[in-house]
């Protein structure tokens, strides 16, 4: 057969000579190999390959696959790995718009032949001794996006589908030594129209490549269907085994052992259902796995292969419109997870997967959706072992073909009901199903993501239903096309508002409800999670959701000034792009947990454990309040010395001095034990740096007057209300330049007990826009090395604070490394905090403590002002000033999280500009 370039633009050609998909089992030569997890029947081809990159097909070295081809102009590339992360081609991130939008006028299934980069790979190798003399196949675990394959100058085959294995039989072409394997990888093909996921657009061989040998008779596929009877103690095991080769007279034996190593079944694997008594069911709470070992012998009784596989017995079904596992309702406390590494992109390793699983277990995450493609097989093994429920999603997304700039316009949607696309997408469903069907963790098959609906996706759903009665089928896209409601067994939506979900659940629906995506964690987000979790307590048919998403998709690179930074769309001269819209993770791109994670951990815990957490916090807060009251009562009054100048009022006490300035509209100096604490006079605070969610709902535009107010307050007067040795009280009044105008006041009372009471009041006016916050702000004169506080742990906001643990905490002041800097570091419900300055030896040189007056407050201590943060596009752009920006708030806007493109913060967490707001606190002098 002669390969043809036209295959790239023909959706009916997606596999040429590709072997049938099969289970992800490991074939070993001996029992010892099987127990070690290693096999002599495989040979890895990972590592360095010869490589040449071309901008388009016309520029490629078309005959590089010839045995005598001159490769002197080839470089090297790492496999697995992305071409674009190894110095070739153009990096690009885009969400829904196709990468070529505005540059090429295309419609499905067209390809721009002038802009379709090609990677030419060559691997030279000798066959391992353990593979010689047998049938040999090659497995490409992931190639993006279309590949042609040659071996020793002979064309072998062609394949698409970036995220499931493509395997080929090399037996007619391979020799023991001096083999040359050549792969031509195209970045774009007709498959590009249905691989329009919201991610960086890469190409190349990004998952492992290996050879495997098939003995005389070979276990080609297994399906160990491990069902559970209604009594939840009887396992129903149906071992289905497909052989190839010299199958006449061959036999397969099966041994199944329990977690303690005792055999629960020994006998043939003949396809009959085997009843096993005393089974421990598999679930998140108890992910019990049984160890199965298949042994294959040829007609002469000679051992040919041994296949180990861990299986879990469970029963997943719909009961009266509720999804149930082993007879009990299941609630998905889930997260969407892209495969990602900040240095390697989607070419992740085992270390990445183990790290992610540790985060899942620590934070009560019990479910994952493999958005929007099948993951590496190891991830499924880890989910089996750790009881993580899976929605396994087909590699299908055509978002840009039916939704343009937010508007639903499916006139040229693919695959739709187009017959030429049907086989292609059903094949993708089949490839995923065949590979992953043995995994207990996979409860639900998903037909893909954001591809509208039609007969083709209905055919995918029918395939899953026909082949696997033990699982359910998911697809959210029918929300936009109700004519195809039958595709999905459940009502699945993304970013539905809590009140919309309630309306659905109160309508007595036939289908249960899940959120396949919710809580869009872009930047500083995840506020209001309570509104969703409470639905699960109230409605049996609300069965949870999957946070969007697990990890920020950002790439570590060096910026124009030589600084290492996590880059996002646009940082790589990529256009079109969606900039930082890929930064939605509950962990940063380097794997560090975001502050919001403590609320994930709290809300994904059981109701009983949440109640116990709340009770502990309430008791700890009550103790702290009692201790603070005792400490305040124990303070002894002293004598104040007052000095009245022409423009300043000075107050001196035991170890402190304050200078109230009429001209600066506030205290210009606050020295405690000889250390100056004020860089400039404190001011009322009206602004926080906009968050991604703020920007998404247009809040900065609506509240822009408060940015001006935060910077350009008008000094309306300075009044001395009390002046004596027993106390001094002064008041500053400010004009707030909003429309309509408003007023604010700061009142300072120097108390003889050695404290400075600060009271801030904002007087609202009708028609004033909503506030980001209100309180008091100041900058310290010198750097602050450490902040200590009594209150809730971590970063907390009014709509994201339940996960905090009440107690005494500390941190080094910092800006959270969101892809685009934004407000961060707030601590609500604070009783007191201390700013520490350190000397060169790291010892405390000075400290300033601020405590609540009549009620807890919120505070932040950040190395930059709100305006500096607002102006930066990367954390490396923030100036190092040597000062600390301290803000104490009586009112603060929540961060929201329903979505990041239109929905405002929930009503209880907004700050009205029409009402009065105040905060009071004491500075201990």
Predicted regions and their residues:
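Extended substrate-binding grooves/exosites of carbohydrate-active enzymes
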Residues: 1-37, 104, 193, 303-627
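Accessory beta-strand-rich segments of carbohydrate-active enzymes
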Residues: 2-19, 27, 31, 35-36, ...
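Beta-strand elements of well-folded, non-transmembrane domains
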Residues: 49, 53, 127-129, 142-144, ...
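Beta-strand/loop-rich accessory regions of lumenal/periplasmic or secreted enzymes
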Residues: 84-86, 92-94, 187, 283, ...
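Short strand-turn-strand beta-turns centered on an Asx-Gly dipeptide
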Residues: 150-156, 257-259, 326, 654, ...
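Extended acidic/polar, glycine-enriched regions
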Residues: 172-178, 242-319
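Low-complexity, Pro/Ser/Thr- and charge-rich linker/hinge segments at domain boundaries
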Residues: 206-223, 313-329, 625-631, 785-789
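Surface beta-strand/loop "capping" patches
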Residues: 216-245, 595-616, 629-647, 760
């Amino acid at each position: 057969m002669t390969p043809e370039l036209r295959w790239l633009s023909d959706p009916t050609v997606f596999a040429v000579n590709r072997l049938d998909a099969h289970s992800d089992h490991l074939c070993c030569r001996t029992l010892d190999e099987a127990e070690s997890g290693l096999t002599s029947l495989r040979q890895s081809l990972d590592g360095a390959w010869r490589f040449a990159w071309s901008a388009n097909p016309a520029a490629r070295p078309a005959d590089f696959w010839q045995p005598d081809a001159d490769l002197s102009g080839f470089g090297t590339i790492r496999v697995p790995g992305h071409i674009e992360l190894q110095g070739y081609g153009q990096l690009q991130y885009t969400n829904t718009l196709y990468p070529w939008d505005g540059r090429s006028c295309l419609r499905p299934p067209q390809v721009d032949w002038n802009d379709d980069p090609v990677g030419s790979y060559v691997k030279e190798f000798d066959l391992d001794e353990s593979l010689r003399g047998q049938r040999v196949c090659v497995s490409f675990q992931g190639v993006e996006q279309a590949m042609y394959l040659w071996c020793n100058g002979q064309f072998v085959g062609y394949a698409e589908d970036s995220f499931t294995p493509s395997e080929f039989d090399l037996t007619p072409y391979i020799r023991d030594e001096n083999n040359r394997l050549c792969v031509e990888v195209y970045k774009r093909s007709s498959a590009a129209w249905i691989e329009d996921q919201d991610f960086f657009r890469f190409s190349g061989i990004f998952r492992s490549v290996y050879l495997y040998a098939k003995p005389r008779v070979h276990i080609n596929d297994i399906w160990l269907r491990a069902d559970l009877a209604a009594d939840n103690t009887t396992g129903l095991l149906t071992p289905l085994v497909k052989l190839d080769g010299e199958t006449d007279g061959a036999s397969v034996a099966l041994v199944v052992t329990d977690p303690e190593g005792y055999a629960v079944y020994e006998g043939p694997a003949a396809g009959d259902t085997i009843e096993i008594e005393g089974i421990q069911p598999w679930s998140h709470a108890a992910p019990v796995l049984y160890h199965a070992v298949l042994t294959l012998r040829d007609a002469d009784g000679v051992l040919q292969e041994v296949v180990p596989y861990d299986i879990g017995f469970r029963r997943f079904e719909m009961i009266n419109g509720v999804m149930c596992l082993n007879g009990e309702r299941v609630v998905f406390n889930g997260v969407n997870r892209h495969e990602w590494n900040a240095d390697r992109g989607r070419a992740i390793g085992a270390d990445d997967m183990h790290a992610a699983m540790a985060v899942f277990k620590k934070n009560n995450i019990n479910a994952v959706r493999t958005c929007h493609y099948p993951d590496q097989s190891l991830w499924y093994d880890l989910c089996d072992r750790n009881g993580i429920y899976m929605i396994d999603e087909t590699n299908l997304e055509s978002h840009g073909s039916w939704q343009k700039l937010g508007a639903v316009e499916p006139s040229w949607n693919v695959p739709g009901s187009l017959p030429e696309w049907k086989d292609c997408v059903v094949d993708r469903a089949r490839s995923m199903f065949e590979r992953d069907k043995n995994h207990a963790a996979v409860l639900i098959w998903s037909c893909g993501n954001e591809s509208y609906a039609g007969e083709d996706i209905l055919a995918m759903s029918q395939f899953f239903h026909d082949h696997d009665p033990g699982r359910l089928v998911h697809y959210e896209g029918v929300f936009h096309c109700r004519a195809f409601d039958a595709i999905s067994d459940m009502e699945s939506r993304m970013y539905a508002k809590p009140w919309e979900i309630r309306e659905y659940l109160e309508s007595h629906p036939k289908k249960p409800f899940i959120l396949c995506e919710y809580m869009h964690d872009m930047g500083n987000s995840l506020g209001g999670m309570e509104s969703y979790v409470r639905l699960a307590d109230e409605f049996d048919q609300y069965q949870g959701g999957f946070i969007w998403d697990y990890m920020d998709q950002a790439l570590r690179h060096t910026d124009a000034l030589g600084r290492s930074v996590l880059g996002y769309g646009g940082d790589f001269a990529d256009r079109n792009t969606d900039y930082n819209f890929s930064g939605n993770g509950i962990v940063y791109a380097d794997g560090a947990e975001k502050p919001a994670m403590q609320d994930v951990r709290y809300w994904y815990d059981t109701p009983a454990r949440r109640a116990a957490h709340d009770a502990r916090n309430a008791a700890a807060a009550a103790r702290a309040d009692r201790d603070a009251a005792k400490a305040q009562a124990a303070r002894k009054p002293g004598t104040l010395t007052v000095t009245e100048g022409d423009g300043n009022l000075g107050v001196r006490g035991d170890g402190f001095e304050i200078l109230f300035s009429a001209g600066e509209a506030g205290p210009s100096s606050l020295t405690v034990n000889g250390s100056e604490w004020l860089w400039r006079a404190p001011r009322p605070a009206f602004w926080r740096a906009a968050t991604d969610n703020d920007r998404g709902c247009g809040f900065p535009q609506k509240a822009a007057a408060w940015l001006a107010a935060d910077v350009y307050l008008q000094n309306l007067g300075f009044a001395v209300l009390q002046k004596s040795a027993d106390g001094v009280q002064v008041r500053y009044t400010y004009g707030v330049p909003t429309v309509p105008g408003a007023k604010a006041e700061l009142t300072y009372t120097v108390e003889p007990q050695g404290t400075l009471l600060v009271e801030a009041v904002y007087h609202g006016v009708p028609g004033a826009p909503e506030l980001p916050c209100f309180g008091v702000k100041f900058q310290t004169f010198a750097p602050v090395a450490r902040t200590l506080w009594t209150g809730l742990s971590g970063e907390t906001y009014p709509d994201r604070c339940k996960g905090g643990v009440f107690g005494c905490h500390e941190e080094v002041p910092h800006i959270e490394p969101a892809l685009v800097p934004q407000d961060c570091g707030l601590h609500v419900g604070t009783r007191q905090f201390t700013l520490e300055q350190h000397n060169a030896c790291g010892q405390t040189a000075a400290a300033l403590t601020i405590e609540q007056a009549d009620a807890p407050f919120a505070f932040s201590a950040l190395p930059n002002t709100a305006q500096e943060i607002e102006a930066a596009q990367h954390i490396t752009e923030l100036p190092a000033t040597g000062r600390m920006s301290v803000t104490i708030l009586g009112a603060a806007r929540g961060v929201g999280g329903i979505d990041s493109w239109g929905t405002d913060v929930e009503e209880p967490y907004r700050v009205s500009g029409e009402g009065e707001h105040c905060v009071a606190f004491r500075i201990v002098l």
